[in-house]
């Protein structure tokens, strides 16, 4: 049994079951790069402030560098006998360079050490997520551009509502992801604060320089309250919430891909590379990837609830409960990263059944609103026009007709103002291109939206790369 670095206070060794129960190294070992990065920064600051000698600092930094290289090459395995990754690295450092390694923890607690490690991890994770959102947005915009002339029925209540451009529909998801990126950007801003120097909760008696450490680690600011610094998990909950909303948007798209690929809709075919078959039914081609995207949304929601419940009613400052924040955060990060990677590859491989979508665009009386608008332009109050067109739809249903099948004479029986000039209002192309309001489905507006999105994505890509 490895002796703990904090063993001095205790007469008896820790119960083995307690060691197993409290250990976190099996999941927090992914933080090793950040722990070493933070320790090197802390060590250099201690030397800069003359708290430890430059010779000792050089030895410590060299030892930490060796540990990092050995871990990266798989030559060093920090086993389950270690409590967590932070203590494991410190113990390995002392094994390598002796007692001088014990000077590293001067003016530092595991509380602010862990807080720093997780913030460093989250900075990288948020940037990675934003890059993947950007890639998915690019794919959606390209798909919208390639299918600019394709018409389809727009839906409300999953019933045919009005004809729209497929490109317009796809660009709706671009807007959702745009809001998601904004949330991740704002989360990054609140994550990007240095807590190191807060120590256990009250700060430290040593003359440290938090601003120096912040500059070294590229943090624009430091925390303002040491108690809050070691107990704050808001940024993780924000990440969980932003991720939940992102996955909610992904699940909506996934659901539509599942529906659209069904025999009943037959709007699309998903590439074989993203589907699986049945163990018993030879004909089946199942949209498993979108289904799992829809399903994995639930686990991200669950992780958010775990974080909220974990931090509910916790007294200040640090409590061991907070060890439990890592797994839901790591799982959420892994889930959204893998989901976005797949989604950005799946979308370009979709084959749209353009003719089928066009045929269905006019079904279900999708031009009824346009006929009502026609009557309004003839001077009929909208509510009356709405009622008249409702009667026409009723007539068509009884006679098994579509609106465009009706003659002028038939339509005139419902209102005398209807004439030959009604027919452009009963054509899908005209119905679409008349909707020129900002954000509308008219081709000109959708082209504008695509061009605007391209400019936004170029600017975002430059911002992320810098």
Curated annotation (Swiss-Prot):
Keywords: Amino-acid biosynthesis, Arginine biosynthesis, Cytoplasm, Lyase. The keyword Cell division does not apply. GO terms for cellular component: cytosol. Disulfide bonds: none annotated. GO terms for molecular function: argininosuccinate lyase activity. Pathway: Amino-acid biosynthesis; L-arginine biosynthesis; L-arginine from L-ornithine and carbamoyl phosphate: step 3/3. Its EC number is 4.3.2.1. It is found in: Cytoplasm. InterPro entries: Arg_succ_lyase_C, Argininosuccinate_lyase, Fumarase/histidase_N, Fumarate_lyase_CS, Fumarate_lyase_fam, Fumarate_lyase_N, L-Aspartase-like. One of its GO terms (biological process) is L-arginine biosynthetic process. It catalyses: 2-(N(omega)-L-arginino)succinate = fumarate + L-arginine. It comes from the Bacteria. It is an enzyme of class 4 (lyase). HAMAP family: Arg_succ_lyase. Belongs to the lyase 1 family. Argininosuccinate lyase subfamily. This is Argininosuccinate lyase.
